[in-house]
From Swiss-Prot:
Further facts: Heme 1 (or BL or b562) is low-potential and absorbs at about 562 nm, and heme 2 (or BH or b566) is high-potential and absorbs at about 566 nm.
Subcellular localization(s) per the UniProt record: Mitochondrion inner membrane
Gene behind the chain: MT-CYB
Subunit structure: The cytochrome bc1 complex contains 11 subunits: 3 respiratory subunits (MT-CYB, CYC1 and UQCRFS1), 2 core proteins (UQCRC1 and UQCRC2) and 6 low-molecular weight proteins (UQCRH/QCR6, UQCRB/QCR7, UQCRQ/QCR8, UQCR10/QCR9, UQCR11/QCR10 and a cleavage product of UQCRFS1). This cytochrome bc1 complex then forms a dimer.
Name the UniProt record assigns to this protein: Cytochrome b
Coiled-coil ranges per UniProt: none
Cofactor(s) for this UniProt protein: heme b
Classification via InterPro entries: Cyt_b/b6_C, Cyt_b/b6_C_sf, Cyt_b/b6_N, Cytb/b6-like_sf, Cytochrome_b, Cytochrome_b_C_euk/bac, Cytochrome_b_N_euk/bac, Di-haem_cyt_TM
Length: 379
């Protein structure tokens, strides 16, 4: 008799996705981040659900409801900090996952890559709206500054901003709708993840060499289930270290002050995972130009597959491209640092140079490097 996992309509899907899936035999730890992102999403949805049971999305009580969660709810402090730092782990995994995709040429799976970009935008939007919910100073002013950027859109800008606000400033209507969107988006993300995996399983996984691995496949279970389990343990360990020893390490002290529309904080800045994009936004003196650069800093990922002119898929055997890739990583770290600095000399100049370098590497230098490497190999 055939095993039930191969015949049952529901179990069959699970079997083909997680058990009998043929996977390349040589994928490294860089391929762990997909499953780690899945774990992060589950952690965020579960902790978020329990937070929503005690949170009130009203300007008068939002801040105190978060305080109540931390002080009075059983293990409320743990749930709250798991959720806040879980977002940081989520973005660390996201950036590693995207970096892996760029390094090993996984972006040639166009559908998977493009849905990944949509997922990135969705997660960023969710994180932004979640940051507004505690209704601290940085929540309020962050929401004001970022939503205000839409007013740079010609003709309809101002109307659009007031429509999003639900009034003439960030207020109760804004907070309530942000809570509603913050609650629903993770489930939309979960659905998109299914589509992401559907397209990935059409082609199968890429591998470090970038060479098709059809002749050498191994079953997902037990090889990659045990490997993913190890990744889960490492991620949970790091998350717990953060939550239990320094839960406020990555947060902003200003957010422990209740929102006050009459008092602007000296330095308005987003969470660390948005600082690179914020630095790019600030490096352009023009409002509309800055907004376009901000959007392009992520949307540029969609252009990468069309700039792939190398005869090799992966960067594994391409030293010039490798150097450029790591310069890009260093550049993003520089932008992250600049995003958290005040707008003054020399930070302005460093930010502008780093922003130009960011787009130059992706749009000009990497394709050039590929050309040179092709020439060297007489291809």
């Amino acid at each position: 008799m055939t095993n039930i996992r191969k015949t049952h309509p529901l179990l069959k899907i699970v079997n083909h996705s997680l058990i009998d899936l043929p996977x390349p035999s040589n994928i490294s730890a860089w391929w762990n981040f997909g499953s780690l992102l899945g774990l992060c999403l589950v952690i965020q949805i579960l902790t978020g659900l329990f937070l929503a049971m005690h949170y009130t999305s009203d300007t008068l009580t939002a801040f105190s409801s978060v305080t109540h969660i931390c002080r009075d709810v059983n293990y409320g402090w743990l749930i709250r900090y798991l959720h806040a730092n879980g977002a940081s782990m989520f973005f660390i995994c996201l950036y590693m996952h995207v970096g892996r995709g760029i390094y090993y040429g996984s972006y040639t799976y166009l559908e998977t890559w493009n849905i990944g970009i949509i997922l990135l935008f969705a997660v960023m939007a969710t994180a932004f709206m979640g940051y507004v919910l505690p209704w601290g100073q940085m929540s309020f002013w962050g929401a004001t500054v970022i939503t205000n950027l839409l007013s740079a859109i010609p003709y309809i800008g101002t109307t659009l901003v007031e429509w999003i606000w639900g009034g003439f400033s960030v207020d109760k209507a804004t907070l309530t709708r942000f809570f509603a969107f913050h609650f629903i988006l993770p489930f939309i993300i979960a659905a998109l993840v299914m589509v992401h995996l559907l397209f990935l399983h059409e082609t199968g996984s890429n591998n470090p060499s970038g060479i098709p691995s059809n002749s050498d496949k191994i079953p997902f279970h037990p090889y990659y289930t045990i490997k993913d389990a190890l990744g889960f343990l490492v991620l949970i360990l790091l998350l717990l270290l953060l939550v239990l020893f320094s839960p406020d390490l990555l947060g902003d002290p200003d957010n422990y002050t209740p929102a006050n529309p009459l008092n602007t904080p000296p330095h308005i800045k987003p969470e660390w995972y948005f600082l690179f994009a914020y630095a790019i936004l600030r490096s352009i003196p023009n409002k509309l130009g800055g907004v376009l650069a901000l959007i392009m800093s992520i949307l540029v990922l969609a252009i990468i597959p069309f700039l792939h002119i190398s005869k090799q898929r992966s960067m594994m055997f391409r030293p010039i491209s490798q150097v450029l890739f790591w310069v890009l990583v260093a550049d993003l770290l520089t932008l992250t640092w600049i995003g958290g600095q005040p707008v003054e000399h020399p930070f302005i100049t460093i930010g502008q140079v780093a922003s130009i370098l960011y787009f130059s590497i992706i749009l000009i230098l990497m394709p050039l490097a590929s050309l040179i490497e092709n020439k060297i190999l007489k291809w």
